[in-house]
Amino acid sequence: MNEYDFDLVIVGAGPAGSSAAFAASSEGVSVALLEKEEAVAETVRTSGGTWIEDAKEFGIPEACYNPISNYSFCSPTKSVTISDEKPKAVVLDVRKTYRHLAEEAQNSGTKLFVNTNVIEVLTDNNKPVGVIAKVSESQVKFNAKMVIDCSGFQSVVVKSLGLAEQWSRFGAGAEYEVKAENVQSDTWWLMVGQEYSPAGYAWIFPTSKNTARIGVGIGKPDSDVDLSLIHI
């Protein structure tokens, strides 16, 4: 079994993991950033809506997002649009943004390991001191002084340590990114009501003048909709 020693092991190379890795390695901490997929942001699980101030705070380049200045909210019977003189929100190019953050972490000294799926958390007196991960058909041991769980919904580290259980409340959804002509690129739409989504909402988030994300999400267990039936 191959073995590595790091000050810090971070599980998950999403925005939280990459940002934590960048902050730590910028201070001279040796960091291993582990991503189970074959590439960062191989699978996207968010529509990318956020505030422009937050994007700028994290140094996200303008090429990674589409500014939004109009916000339309719709129900089956009413609708309202709120407008700002200047954009206050953005829709991220999620894949490009996540990969930018991971690249920034690597440039600061972080070692990124992709296709690296954590299967065991190593402990010493109930303190996490590393992980064992599956890489292709082999296993790799990562020793660490500290482990940070940034694996999102799966929470592989904290669940292994008994610090968290399976989420009892969560959201699930489906989304398509589509091409369309003359998209109103500075406006996003949120739709609420049982006709659109039981215990949830639907959305149209423009990513450019000719592309948009169209999706629907529900809350569980508030909605009894069979998750396998979610479609757009």
Positions of predicted regions on the chain:
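Beta1/beta-strand and adjacent pyrophosphate-binding region of the FAD-binding site
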Residues: 2-14
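Predominantly flavin-linked oxidoreductase catalytic cores and closely associated redox partners
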Residues: 108-229
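Short, hinge-like loop/turn segments at secondary-structure boundaries
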Residues: 48-52, 165-166
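N-terminal Rossmann-fold NAD(P) dinucleotide-binding loop
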Residues: 17
